[in-house]
């Protein structure tokens, strides 16, 4: 990994993503899909100190928006500043392509933010589980985690019991990176949309755990799923869980 970030190369990466097609949806122009915007109604400087609202489904407006975004990217003074221009669903995609040009510190900080900003990062169709592992394994844990998280991470036992809740929607995503130290958290994921699913318990050696995140009260650990052992279904506690919410 690079000792220093090559900011010029990171900007080139961002500009390449900026040049990709804006994909319309049934709700366009209000909702579109693109690494730098999720709405087709955007504001750009009008050259008079104000802003102008434009429709990105129109070719001329789209060109002007791309030019405006390119100027912002060019003015950015850090890789993190560029990363923050990318919308959440594409955060890990940006990191995947920018990673060869990032220092270990910058990569770790962006990875931590991208992971915790995303609703279901391990289900990102643009980034595979193996690619995510190639991000987490070389990351600097002191940059990846907050101080309190790092302290908790260091105190984990040599072998750790972890839990994961899945629903019919993600029933095949058992051996994946994201697990919890807390069974109640896994239960919450099973029932949060009124669904019934399954909670799994497994063991994993600490050396195959790469991060601990306490945000959103999830007690989340990032693991190499190939080293999970003794994966078993936990006794169905759904009725007890639902009663506890009344």
Question: Model-found features: residue ranges?
Answer:
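Conserved NAD+-utilizing ADP-ribose enzyme module
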Residues: 1-162, 167-177, 183-246
């Amino acid at each position: 990994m690079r000792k220093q970030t090559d900011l010029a190369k990171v900007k080139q990466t961002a500009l390449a993503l900026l040049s990709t097609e804006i994909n319309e949806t049934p709700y366009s122009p209000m909702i579109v899909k693109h690494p730098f915007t999720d709405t087709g109604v955007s504001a750009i400087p009008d050259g008079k100190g104000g802003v102008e609202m434009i429709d990105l489904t129109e070719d001329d407006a789209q060109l002007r928006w791309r030019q405006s975004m390119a100027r912002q990217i060019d003015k950015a003074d850090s890789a993190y500043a560029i990363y923050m221009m990318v919308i959440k669903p594409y955060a890990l995609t940006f990191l995947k392509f920018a990673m060869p040009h990032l220092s270990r510190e910058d990569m770790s900080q962006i990875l931590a933010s991208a992971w915790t900003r995303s609703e279901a990062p391990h289900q990102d169709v643009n980034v595979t589980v193996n690619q995510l592992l190639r991000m987490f394994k070389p990351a600097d844990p002191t940059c990846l985690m907050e101080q309190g998280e790092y302290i908790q991470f260091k105190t984990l036992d040599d072998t750790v019991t972890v839990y994961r809740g899945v629903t019919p929607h993600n029933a095949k995503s058992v051996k994946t990176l994201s697990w919890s130290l807390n069974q109640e958290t896994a239960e919450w994921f099973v029932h949060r949309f009124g669904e019934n699913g399954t909670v799994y318990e497994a063991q994993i050696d600490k050396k195959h755990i790469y991060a601990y995140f306490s945000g959103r009260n999830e007690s989340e650990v990032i693991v190499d799923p190939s080293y999970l052992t003794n994966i078993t279904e936990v006794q169905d506690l759904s009725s007890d869980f639902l009663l506890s919410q009344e």
